[in-house]
């Protein structure tokens, strides 16, 4: 699910050389490796915000890392190793000041907390299905509606296509011009 967001951002050229993605030292490798790979492809830079001795994100350091180059913050709601609950509401509010997107990895929180994506105001929220007793290999990717409408699918077919002919197609939400 994280790779889908990153891949789509590459396709849309919304990440370019010099842009920055912020993660924390609390992240599971599934929220590190996709961004490392995307940075290698795009020339964007991965910026890591530190934690203190209690395992909490140092908010002052997080704020220092935010700037006009920040395009995405990808942060865990709850740490998989320490159980630390990150201040996602505060982090989203700060992200909005810099007009960057925010992705919440809710793999550890989805089974234990009520998650209201409208209240959180995140752009993306992801979690693995097996954390909620679903089968292994499936998961959830929430995308804020306005971003979903802008996204360019990199896998197509089925109900997403309104009409297809030999050399072109019309997506279900598009109108003919």
Regions found by a protein language model. Give the residues of each.
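Conserved active-site segment immediately N-terminal to the catalytic lysine
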Residues: 104-106, 110, 116-134, 139-143, ...
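Single conserved hydrophobic/aromatic residue that forms the stacking wall/gate
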Residues: 1-6, 11, 169-172, 176-177
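Active-site C-terminal subdomain of aminotransferase-like
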Residues: 133-137, 142-171
């Amino acid at each position: 699910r994280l790779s889908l967001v990153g891949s789509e951002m590459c396709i849309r050229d919304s990440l370019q050389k010099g842009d920055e993605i912020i993660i924390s030292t609390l992240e599971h490798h599934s929220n590190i490796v996709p961004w490392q790979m995307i940075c290698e492809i795009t020339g964007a830079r991965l910026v890591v915000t530190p934690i203190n001795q209690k395992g909490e994100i140092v908010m002052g350091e997080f704020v220092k890392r935010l700037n006009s180059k920040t395009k995405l913050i990808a942060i865990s709601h709850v740490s998989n190793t320490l159980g630390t609950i990150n201040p996602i509401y505060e982090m989203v509010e700060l992200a909005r000041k810099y007009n960057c997107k925010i992705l919440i990895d809710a793999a550890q929180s989805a089974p234990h907390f009520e998650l209201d994506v409208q209240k959180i105001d995140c752009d993306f929220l992801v979690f693995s299905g097996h954390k909620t007793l679903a089968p292994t290999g499936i998961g959830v990717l929430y995308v804020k509606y306005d971003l979903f409408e802008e996204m360019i699918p990199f896998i197509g077919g089925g109900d997403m296509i309104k009409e297809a002919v030999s050399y072109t197609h019309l997506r279900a939400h598009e109108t003919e011009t």
